[in-house]
Amino acid sequence: TRFDNFYSGSLPCMPARRELHTGKYNFLYRGWGPLEPFDRSVFEVLRQNGVYSHLCTDHSHYWEDGGATYHNRYDTWEGFRGQEGDRYVAHDIRAEIPPRASALNKAGISVEQHYRNRTRQRTEDEMSGTRTVRAGLEFLAEHADRDNWFLQIECFDPHEPFYVPQNYRALYGLPEQETLNWP
């Protein structure tokens, strides 16, 4: 089954996920937060009806206070670390943090964490988004001949910080140094 006629009422982060899980509009009723105990997730309904569900994601908010209880509604899940301010790389690892090129760019601990996380994601193959999609493709290959399953490949990007590796920046003549990446 292909879902190609779905419209979200809440575009930001966790409110949009709650809509995907419950089919209920979240906007104007509730802010950023977890699924509630009374929420009925589509993935639990799928399980009750014999459909196996799997999540591949690099969305670290699933493991934070206020964002939890989504990923455990799937039968199984894989999470890939290192997006945004994900507390992945230890604080004592030095990272080169460029000067703030725009007053619109965010500053502070989550930016510092982002640059520390990049020390583990130097190549495209190491990027959490690449690893997320690769895991989803592996799942598809392993389950292509099977029936009654649902796969969700959920990439955090596009999401601030808008980090673009230099080889892609060069394709469009963009400056080597990042300018506005975290408004």
Where are these regions (language model features)?
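Catalytic domains that recognize anionic headgroups
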Residues: 1-183
